[in-house]
Design a protein with these regions (language model features):
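Short, surface-exposed alpha-helical segments at coil->helix boundaries
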Residues: 13-20, 43, 97-100
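Conserved RecA-like P-loop NTPase ATPase core
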Residues: 1, 59, 90, 123
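Short glycine-rich anion-binding loops that position phosphate/pyrophosphate groups of nucleotides
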Residues: 7, 63-66, 91-94
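Ser/Thr/Gly-rich flexible loops in soluble cytosolic domains mediating phosphotransfer, phosphorylation
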Residues: 80-98
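Catalytic-core regions built around general acid/base machinery
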Residues: 19, 76-80, 102
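N-terminal beta1-alpha1 ligand-phosphate binding loop
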Residues: 1-23
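Structured adenosyl-cofactor binding patch, chiefly the S-adenosyl-L-methionine
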Residues: 97-141
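S-adenosyl-L-methionine/SAH cofactor-binding core of RNA-modifying enzymes
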Residues: 27-85
Length: 142
């Protein structure tokens, strides 16, 4: 996960950290925080970070993106057969057009609008849930 800015809300940061630790125990997971700024400078920093991950499948979080069920997300990630995946979360004003153009898919968590901190916590939870679905963990209930 590449995200803009540091989390200021301690409760959300703690939840995100908990899911990050769980994901790290399941395999290779990294949360990269980039400095915030205007959308274009954030976009430049994101593209620089992505240059190091040219083999990854890129999901950009954007309100115009497609929503997925948790099961569908788990299936999609499983179908990548171990290929690295990067989820990009922009700052308070979203992602630059250049970042969206670089993405393999635009992904929306919901038609609702969330703060970027809530969105970060939600994507960490959904990634953990996707792993739980694939491993048959009791965390996910149908």
């Amino acid at each position: 996960v590449i995200a803009i800015g540091k989390m200021k809300n301690r409760s959300l940061a703690k939840l995100c950290d908990d899911f990050s630790k769980r994901l790290k125990r399941q395999g290779n997971f990294e949360l990269i925080e980039l400095k915030d700024g205007d959308v274009e400078s954030e976009g430049h920093r994101i593209l620089e970070a992505l240059a190091k991950r040219s083999d990854a499948s890129i999901y950009a979080m954007a309100e115009e993106g497609m929503t997925r069920t948790s099961q569908r997300l788990a299936d999609e990630l499983h179908s990548l057969q171990g290929r690295p995946v990067v989820f990009i979360l922009g700052g308070a004003y979203g992602l630059s057009d250049a970042v969206k153009a670089r993405a393999d898919a635009l992904f929306a968590l919901s038609p609702l609008t969330f703060t970027h901190e809530i969105a970060r916590m939600l994507i960490c939870e959904q990634l953990y849930r996707a792993v739980a679905i694939q491993t048959g963990s009791k965390y996910h209930h149908e």
